C-alpha cells in the first residue's frame, strides 16, 4: 500500500485534531501536495535550513515539525528572506511539510503528558482545559506530589530528565514543592492559571524577567528549562505515534528523527 501525504495528514489529525489548536496558531499541511506519495518521513522540532538539507540528503520527502514554518502569513516568498529561501528549496525538492503545534501540546498523551512522564510522574491533571475538545485536552499539566520535593531536587530532576546543561530558576532551593505545573515551550500566558491552581512551582521555557520577578514575589518558583529543552519530546511523541499507526496499516515507510535540529543556544 502506498502512503500518500493526505493519508499521513489523516493519521496525525486523528491523534491530534486541528480543532485543538489555540486560536493564534497555524497547524496542518504547510507546504506540499496531498496526492503525493510519501517515500520517507523526517521529524523535527523546527523546519530549519539544516533540517531541510538533511531531508534532501536522506531522501525524505515529508518533514513533520512541531513549530509551524508558516506561523504568520508571509507578505512574499522570495530568495530575499530566510523563510522564502526555505519554502523555495522545499518546493524545488518536492518536499511536503506538516506541523502539529498546540494541538499536539493539548491532546491526551501529547507533549504535555510526555513531559510529565519524562520527569518520572504518571498522574497529572489539565491546567487550562480546551473547551473545543470532545475528549479531555488542554494546555499544561499539574502534578500533585505524593511526597514533597525541594526546589533543588526538582531542578536536578528537570536537568537530568531533559538532558540539558543548565537551566534558570527563581525561588529558595530549600522551598518545599507540593505541586507543580508543566507548560512546555513558551508558557507565560498560562502562569496566572497555574497560580490559581495553587501550585508551588511552574516548569516551562522562554520566560521573561518581569514575569519571573512578579511570580518570585508571589512565592511561586519558576524553572525555565528552555524552549528547546521542554519541547524536544514532541519529536519522540510524533515518531512513536506514526510508527504505531503505520505498523497497524502494514506500511513500512521509514521514519527518521532529524539529527540536525539542535538548540540554537549555547552555554558557557
From Swiss-Prot:
Homohexamer. Pfam families: DUF34_NIF3. The lineage of its organism: Bacteria, Bacillati, Bacillota, Clostridia, Eubacteriales. It comes from Clostridium acetobutylicum (strain ATCC 824 / DSM 792 / JCM 1419 / IAM 19013 / LMG 5710 / NBRC 13948 / NRRL B-527 / VKM B-1787 / 2291 / W). Keywords: Metal-binding. GO terms for cellular component: cytoplasm. The keyword Cell wall biogenesis/degradation does not apply. SUPFAM superfamilies: NIF3 (NGG1p interacting factor 3)-like. A divalent metal cation 1 binds at residues 66, 105, 231. InterPro entries: DUF34/NIF3 (IPR002678), DUF34/NIF3_sf (IPR036069). One of its GO terms (molecular function) is metal ion binding. This is GTP cyclohydrolase 1 type 2 homolog. A divalent metal cation 2 binds at residues 67, 227, 231. Belongs to the GTP cyclohydrolase I type 2/NIF3 family.
Amino acid at each position: 500500500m502506498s502512503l500518500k501525504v493526505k493519508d499521513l495528514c489523516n493519521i496525525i489529525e486523528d491523534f491530534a485534531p486541528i480543532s485543538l489548536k489555540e486560536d493564534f496558531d497555524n497547524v496542518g499541511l504547510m507546504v506540499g501536495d496531498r496526492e503525493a506519495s510519501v517515500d520517507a518521513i523526517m521529524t523535527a522540532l523546527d523546519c530549519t535550513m539544516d533540517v531541510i538539507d538533511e531531508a534532501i540528503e536522506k531522501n525524505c520527502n515529508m518533514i513533520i515539525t512541531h513549530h509551524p514554518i508558516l506561523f504568520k502569513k508571509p507578505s512574499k516568498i522570495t530568495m530575499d528572506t530566510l523563510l522564502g529561501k526555505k519554502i523555495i528549496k522545499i518546493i524545488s525538492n518536492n518536499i511536503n511539510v506538516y506541523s502539529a503545534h498546540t494541538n499536539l501540546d493539548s491532546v491526551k498523551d501529547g507533549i504535555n503528558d510526555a513531559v510529565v512522564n519524562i520527569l518520572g510522574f504518571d498522574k497529572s491533571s489539565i491546567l487550562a482545559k480546551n473547551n473545543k475538545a470532545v475528549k479531555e485536552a488542554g494546555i499544561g499539566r499539574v502534578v500533585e506530589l505524593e511526597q514533597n520535593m525541594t526546589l533543588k531536587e526538582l531542578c536536578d530532576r528537570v536537568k537530568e530528565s531533559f538532558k540539558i546543561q543548565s537551566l534558570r530558576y527563581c525561588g529558595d532551593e530549600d522551598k518545599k514543592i507540593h505541586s507543580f505545573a508543566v507548560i512546555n515551550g513558551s508558557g507565560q500566558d498560562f502562569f496566572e492559571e497555574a497560580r490559581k491552581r495553587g501550585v508551588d512551582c511552574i516548569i516551562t521555557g522562554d520566560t521573561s524577567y518581569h514575569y519571573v520577578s512578579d511570580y518570585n514575589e508571589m512565592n511561586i518558583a519558576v524553572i525555565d528549562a528552555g524552549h528547546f529543552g521542554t519541547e524536544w519530546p514532541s519529536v519522540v511523541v510524533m515518531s512513536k505515534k506514526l510508527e504505531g499507526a503505520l505498523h497497524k496499516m502494514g506500511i513500512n515507510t521509514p521514519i527518521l528523527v532529524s539529527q540536525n535540529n539542535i538548540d540554537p543556544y549555547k552555554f558557557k
